[in-house]
Amino acid sequence: MSQHNEKNPHQHQSPLHDSSEAKPGMDSLAPEDGSHRPAAEPTPPGAQPTAPGSLKAPDTRNEKLNSLEDVRKGSENYALTTNQGVRIADDQNSLRAGSRGPTLLEDFILREKITHFDHERIPERIVHARGSAAHGYFQPYKSLSDITKADFLSDPNKITPVFVRFSTVQGGAGSADTVRDIRGFATKFYTEEGIFDLVGNNTPIFFIQDAHKFPDFVHAVKPEPHWAIPQGQSAHDTFWDYVSLQPETLHNVMWAMSDRGIPRSYRTMEGFGIHTFRLINAEGKATFVRFHWKPLAGKASLVWDEAQKLTGRDPDFHRRELWEAIEAGDFPEYELGFQLIPEEDEFKFDFDLLDPTKLIPEELVPVQRVGKMVLNRNPDNFFAENEQAAFHPGHIVPGLDFTNDPLLQGRLFSYTDTQISRLGGPNFHEIPINRPTCPYHNFQRDGMHRMGIDTNPANYEPNSINDNWPRETPPGPKRGGFESYQERVEGNKVRERSPSFGEYYSHPRLFWLSQTPFEQRHIVDGFSFELSKVVRPYIRERVVDQLAHIDLTLAQAVAKNLGIELTDDQLNITPPPDVNGLKKDPSLSLYAIPDGDVKGRVVAILLNDEVRSADLLAILKALKAKGVHAKLLYSRMGEVTADDGTVLPIAATFAGAPSLTVDAVIVPCGNIADIADNGDANYYLMEAYKHLKPIALAGDARKFKATIKIADQGEEGIVEADSADGSFMDELLTLMAAHRVWSRIPKIDKIPA
C-alpha cells in the first residue's frame, strides 16, 4: 500500500526503496485517496491527469461507441496472464539457471513478451503520419432529400456517429504539431447505409492536378533522401525546386505560407473536401458539390515565432489542446457546408470544376450550412483507434458519387493500396475502428488477420446451395443498392491535361488580394523564411519569378528579404486575369470577417505571494462566466497565500506553462515586488506582447509596463486599472474575442523575446 506522511496525508512516498522490495507485481500501489482515478465529469485543462474516453465520459454513447464496447479491455481486478491466458507468477525476472546463471530459452513468458514488443510498431502513414483523433456525431439541420438520397442527410432527427482525424502532412509520427504545413481533416461517417469518408484538408485545393505527380510531389516535400533532413518542414531545396518548376503548386503553396499553415488549434481550423463530388437524389438528378467544415469556435492561427517555439516547448500542442478541450466539455463543433453547382452550370466559370488546384470562390457560390458535427469523446487507445483508422475517399454511400477530377481518381486507388501495406492485408475493414455500424455481407474471404468467421458454405455467386445469399439490392430511392451516376463518357485514350487546367496564377492572386494587410505581411514572412533555408540561389530566384507572375508587390517584398533584384521583364509582367471578374473574396481571409467567441480559451494569471484576493476572485468569476479557463502560475510549484489568508494551489510555473500555450495574460494586484525581478515572469509578459496577446495589469502590476517598454497610457491590447472590476474584465474579454492585437504589429520587431 502507499505510505502516507503522518503530518500531511496528501504527501505520498515511494513504496519501493531497495532490491528486497523489487517484486511489486502482487501489491496495490495506488494512493489510498483514489487520486489516481479521473473524475467522470468535465475538468479544466491540466486540472487532472488525462484519461481514456470511456473513463472520462462513460455516458457519452452512440451506435459506434457501443459497438466498440465489445472489444474494449479493462485490466482492473484481473490477473496478469500471457497472451494464451496462463497466469503469470513472476513478471520481474527471466528464467535462469541459478540467480546469476544464463537465461533459459524455454522461458516462454520472456519470449512472448519480447517478441510482441519487437513487433508492436506498424509502418506509419506515408503522409499524414502525425495525427490526432476524436469521436463525435453529425446531425443535419434539415432534410436534404431534394439534392441527395443519402440517408444520413435525409432527416434532421438522424444522428450519425463520426470519427475525425486531424494531421500534418510532411513530418513523421513523432514530429511536432505546430510546424508550417497543410493539415489533414478526415471524417468517417458511420451511416446506416455504410461508411462515408470525407478525406480532406484545411485548404480547399491541393498542390497537384493529376495523381500521377503525387509520388513526385511527396518525394520533393519529404526529408531529402541523402540525409533525411528536414523533419516536419518544407523549408528545403527539393520542395522549392519542385514548386519553382511546377506552377500548378502555387495556389496551395500560398495557403501554406499564410496563417492557414499554422492554425491555433484544430478547433479553430476550417476543413475542405478539396475535390468536386456529386450529390444524387432519388430521381437520379446530379448536383456538383464541394464540401466545407466551418468551425463554430471561429478561425484563428498562431504567429510564426510562436509556432516555432512551440515545436520545442510543447511539440504535442494541438494534440493536447484537442484532448483537453474535449475533457473540459469545450467540444469542437463544425458546420458542414455545401457549395452546390447545378450540372448545367458546369462550364459557367473561367476555371474547371474538376481542377483540384482551383477553388470555387464563396462570393460566387455561397456555402450553405446544412448540419453540425460535434466531437465529444476522446479515444480509449491511441494505437487501436487513431493509428489503425483507415480513411478512404472511395468510401461513399448511395446519394454520393465521384467526378472525373484526375487527382481524386488516383486517390481512389492509392488509399486501398496503402492501407493494405500499412495494416497488413485486405481485412483492415475488420479492425474495430473501421467496421461499419450496419451489417456487411459479401464473398470476400480469408487473407491476413481475418476476424469474422463466415458460415456461408458458398463463397461465390450465383449459388444455389445457400439460396444465392447474400443477394444484390436493386437501386432505389431509399436503402437501395449503390448505383453509379450514369455520366456519358467518350474520348480517345491520351496522356494530356485539359487546356482548362492551364491557368496557374489567377487563383493565387485572388487569395493574396483577399488577405488583410497583416496577413499579407505574414505571407511575405512565410516565403522569406522558407526560401532563406534554400541553399541553391537559382531555386530562390525561380520561386521569386513565379511570385512575380502572381503579384508584383508580393514578389518585390520577398525578393527584398532575399537580396534579389527583380529584372525589368519581371517588373513589367502583366497581372493574371481576375477569377470570374472577382478581385477579392473575404472568406479566403482568416480575419477579414470576425467570428467565434472566447469559450474554451485559456488565460494565464501570474500570481504573487499576498495577491489581492478580491481582485483574483473577480477575475476568476468573470472568466468562468464566459467559459474561459484560468491557469494560476507562479515561480515555483506548490501554493501561494493571498492577502486574506486564502491558500491558492499553483497549476504550473511561469516556465512550465509558457505564454505560447495561452491566449491572454493577467497580472492581478498584490505584492508585485515578489515577482518583479523574476526573469521568467518578465519574459512571460514580453513574449506575450510580442505574440500580440492581450495583457491585463491591475493595480501595482502596472509596473510591468516598463518590462515591455510601454510608456503610453491606453495602448490597445493593454488593459490597466486600479482593480479588476467589471469594465477591466469586459475590455480584456473583448480583446480576446479578436484573437490577437493586430494593431501592435509595427512595434513587435523591437521586442527581443
Curated annotation (Swiss-Prot):
Subcellular location: Cytoplasm
SMART domains listed in its UniProt record: Catalase
Pfam families for the chain: Catalase, Catalase-rel, Catalase_C
EC number: 1.11.1.6
Region span, Disordered: 1-61, 459-493
Cytoplasm keyword on record: yes
Known partners and oligomeric status: Homotetramer.
Protein name, per record: Catalase HPII
Organism of this sequence: Escherichia coli (strain K12)
Name of the encoding gene: katE
